[in-house]
Amino acid sequence: MKLQSSRTFIENISLDSARQYLTLHIPMDEYNIDEEKIFTYFNESKGSRYWFKSKDSTYNVVGINYIESMWRDKFQPEATADSKKALFQKLQQEKLGDDLKSKLSLFGGTLFDDKDTTDEWNDFKMVEFHLPEWQFDLKKNEVFLTRSKTELNMDGLLEEIDGVLSGIESAEITEKEKPVVKSKRDIFPNEWKLLVEEAVNNLNDEFKKVVLARQKLITFESKAKRLYLIRRLKDEADTYTIYYEKGKSTFVSKTPEKLFSIKGEQLTTNAIAGSIQRVEDSRENNVQKEFLLNDEKNLFEHRVVRESIVSDIVPFSEGLNYKKNPLLMENKYIYHLFTPIQAMLKKDSDEFKILKQIHPTPAVGGLPKNLAKDYIKEHEYGTRGLYAAPLGIIHEDKDCEFAVGLRSMLISARSATLFAGCGIVKGSDPEAEFLETEVKFTPMLNVLEATTNELHRSTDGTNV
């Protein structure tokens, strides 16, 4: 048995009767384990699994079986922080090794806003974070097992853990067939163009920008194979990977956008706004990049987003650091302007208060923030749910990382609803904005292998 060296740690654990769960922190260096094998082995746990991989691979975490969840119908930072504290207080955490580096985390986030959601989002709460029974840190090759003390068999626990890890290692990958697309259609395309036209007419010196999203519906001949999607999601390394099962629904995102992360007292975020198509010809690509870096409209849009984000985090920080000129972010299908921003946080800063303040950024909502958010609630077709919403990892301390759920889709049994949006400003053309959203559908169409060739130059400078 590969974990034999951990037996002494198991034998020396003294159970704390005041704690409801025992969480074991276990090394798995000796096991050859990846995302596909984990999802294959735990195929019967559908509806209670997630995978969160950050863009720079700081996190690559898979969670299986939500053993405990914290949720609320409204996002109130203080109450959410209290719920997190109460959940972690239920846990007796024990390390089966001296050199373990990972930290137990919860996965989840909030919906885009508190607007009453339509039926397709019924599986998700307004605020929700999950503690899984099995949590695999594939970056550090470590695993956490959380088990209710009423279900513990300490004598056979090490053998059970080794059996699961060995079973994952030898799991035979199945469900290799791609989903067969039955139909593909835009939802209310003409109405959406009229909505854009109406928004342009409503914009003024006070109401400067609003981001409007639309949807595309894909139906399949049979149920979409989740393991096939996991394989496809592994193909693109320059974005976040978010795969979130809850009940009968699965939310998937390949977003390029970090909302923010905290490590110790340092907050890191990015202002991302301004985009242009990436093409196959290298010379044309250079023209595209040069255009984006010098285009006044894109630079203005980027500057507005950056200034808004900086303004949001100033109350929580003791100092800020960022460059005045944006850099170029290269993704598989598109280029973005982005500015990295770092802040040293005040000692009493709280990740949920920061989340409440910074979301939604102007890149996914508009300006001014509250006016744009209200306009979206009142006029946009359907509800956003987890689209453009914050999703990520939180720890017992305030360390965390949140991404923005862009380039995304919601999958049910035989259909997928894709989401994309664009920023509407004075002078926006409805037809051009409609075509712009086609570019942003491409990552999810590619995951489903239902690709489109309708790629073109961005006109709105918005990363949604």
Which residues does each PLM region occupy?
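Active-site pocket-lining segments that scaffold enzyme catalytic pockets across diverse folds
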Residues: 173-258, 302-305, 309, 316, ...
